[in-house]
Amino acid sequence: MSPQIATNTDVGLEQLLEFVRLRHHMVLITSRADGSPQSSPVTGGVDDSGRIVIATYPQRAKTKNARRRPEVSVLVLSEEWDDAWVQVDGTCEVLDAVDGPEALDGFVEYFRNIAGEHSDWDEYRQAMIDQGKSLLRITPARWSTVSTGGFPPQDS
């Protein structure tokens, strides 16, 4: 079996978003109050405005950290461990379901872009309020190459 050679592919914003849209396993990296990093495995997607979106709860460390310091990073992983990944750095906006229609529309868009249509959107909106959910919307500012792990390429 031949060794896997590492790859690094530069991408523009549209290519980045296409890559992320197909992947929902992510690690969100925020900053604790003392400045140290805090990592959270999450499920995420891309909304119609090109923001990475993650549903969570206001009591979670990631949400508190993002409210305090909105500069975050998201490591987007493929389904297979040895497949491609990318790091996206950006600014995070936190919306709470109880904030009203804009937040609830954001949750609908989040669900649609990850899982498709819901059988009852009014029921879904009410569930987001009842559960006290928060939505993180991250606007990409910069990103790494889309990369795969492996052995370094041999110089010719």
Residues covered by each model-derived region:
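Short, basic/aromatic recognition patches
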Residues: 2-27
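Short beta-strand segments
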Residues: 23-58, 66, 72-76, 85-88
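Alpha-helix boundary recognition
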Residues: 20-21, 67-68, 129
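Charged, gly/pro-rich active-site loop segments
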Residues: 1-11, 84-156
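Generic signal for short, ordered secondary-structure residues
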Residues: 13-14, 45-46, 117
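AMP-binding (ANL) adenylation modules
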Residues: 79-81
